[in-house]
């Protein structure tokens, strides 16, 4: 990324928080994307902002990119609110768009997996499938909680662990800098 303004950093960070929130969700089996969508939108909603697209859609194999029945959206759509099942891949892509200004969208793919089973039922979770570092130069930690920073640090650690074995030494040095742990 090139230089970013303070305002762009504020929104970049809010959208990033939404991406991290949704990717870290733990939820009971039976939930749909409508139940979880607020996790991605909440940082923007707290600012009185929103984005006018679904937060995510099902992703098939063989490049069948928009494949249902799974999705994340804030609005109930008849026939379009499937229960999130183990093995479903869904995009996690909140955004923010300023007319005559700038746009931001972070996009990860997340895999739905079974988590622990308790007397309350089967819990589910997501696993990230996308491993690309977020640009620290565009992030303003003043708009993040300690929990947000910890989530981002865990994500960046996973990026380094998954990607670095395939890189040259110079590329590893670059990736190490982009994924190094930061403090609030």
Describe each region flagged by the PLM.
Residues 1-184:
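Active-site neighborhoods and metal-handling regions in enzymes and metal-associated proteins
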């Amino acid at each position: 990324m090139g230089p970013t303004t303070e305002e762009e950093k504020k929104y970049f960070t809010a959208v990033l928080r939404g991406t991290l929130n949704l990717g870290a969700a733990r939820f009971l089996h039976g939930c749909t994307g409508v139940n979880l969508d607020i996790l991605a939108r909440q940082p923007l909603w707290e600012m009185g902002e929103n984005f006018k697209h679904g937060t995510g859609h099902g992703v098939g194999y063989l490049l069948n990119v928009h494949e249902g029945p799974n999705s994340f959206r804030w609005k109930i759509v008849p026939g379009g609110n499937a229960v999130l099942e183990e093995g479903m891949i869904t995009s996690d892509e909140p955004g923010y768009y300023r007319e005559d200004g700038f746009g931001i969208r972070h996009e990860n793919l997340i895999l739905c997996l079974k988590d622990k089973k308790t007397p309350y039922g089967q819990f589910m979770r997501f696993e990230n499938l996308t491993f690309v570092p977020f640009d620290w130069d565009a992030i303003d930690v003043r708009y993040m909680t300690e929990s947000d920073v910890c989530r981002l640090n865990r994500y960046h650690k996973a990026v380094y662990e998954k990607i670095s074995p395939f890189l040259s030494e110079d590329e590893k040095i670059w990736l190490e800098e982009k994924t190094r742990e930061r403090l609030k």
